[in-house]
Amino acid sequence: QFGRTVPVSGAHKENRAVGMMYWLWHGSYTSRVVDTTKIIEEKGLDYALYNLQEYNPAGVPHYWGEPLYGYYRSDDEYIIRRHMMLLMYAGVDFIAFDASNTITYPNEVRKICEVICELRGEGFNVPQITYYTHTASIQTVQQAYDEIYSHEEYREAWYCMEGKPLMIAQTDPAKDKERTTGQHAHLSAYDPQPLGEEIMDFFYFRVPAWCGVDPVTDDGWPWVDWNFPNDLYGNLMTLSPASHHYAMMSWSAMGYDYPEEQIPRAVWSGGNVSWGRGYAFSDRQNNTARAAQGSFFQAQWNVVKRAQPEIVYLDGWNEWCSGYARNAEYGNVAESYDSFNMEFSRDLELMKGGYNDAFLIQTAMNVKEYKCELPETFIKDVHKTIDINAGAGQWEEVKALYRCTGSRNFGRNARGVQPSLKYAVPA
């Protein structure tokens, strides 16, 4: 697709790591699927933008599209195993759980850790874990420590930097309180105390950075970057398939085809729209025809190739959902900051229809070039007939090795986020 091939890798470069944001909320917030892409296909963009109260009166989070494996729950072990396999093949070293809203999803995390420990014990270099915290950061770190990091049996699942498990968190109580209470009125009583010495010594901390709010610092870790070329936070760059740096994703999908009286352009930073998957800096335009090809994502990878940071952080793997609201001040247009449709969304996970596996292949291709030297020579396929009655020496000239991930076949028999959805795959 798009003429892409994943290059053959040679020696690994030193000081190269790739991480990816990972969401655990599927099945926790809604038992009903509302898919914006399907609504647009059936009734058009105008209906999706202006009739939110009709098709989603309860205000449940929307899926912008359908994942390849269906509307799965985050505790579906078949999905966890597929994710770990795909991310391993793409060269991802760690996943960062989105705990930015204080929720740590301990049951889902334990199941993921068990799968990681099992597969790594069998020799498969699947990604390890960390957490990305933000709101009530100190409280969230304590929860993650109590639930996961105080359990030695999960050690093999922890991603470490400088010999300590990585934790993205604000550990200054005053700053944590200011950010939390300033952004969330319902948490006005939040009054964090310093983390204990044991926890402070246990983790390697980096500070979560909020674009448009926090300055660029060497110890910062942005979940998304609203600048291009991407900022360098010490040894780290953050990339995303799309970026809502100017406006909500739902508003950006309107483009410039709607008159100003329908939506105040003042809230769009001078009338600009956000960078979608098909945005190109050559013409400074979003182009739906380029969305599946990932022109915006590739532009950022080209920055990485020039800057050569030690860590590349990707936002993200499997968000899929976004909260929706409407505001009479803005013409009751559907408001969704984080995602709306294929063009204006940030997921890299495989999609049913749409871009299919294009963003996984694009990620794998760029990660290989970033992390590995590209050899001048490589092992070629050998085509030969094997006599099952002859000896093992017949295999000596066959150098390539292919392994199935995991020592056992694992089927699927699970419900989706909507109880009526059932998914089955034989072992």
Where does each model-flagged region fall?
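Glycan-processing catalytic domains of CAZymes
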Residues: 1-387
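Order/disorder boundary and secretion-linked terminal/linker segments
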Residues: 368-427
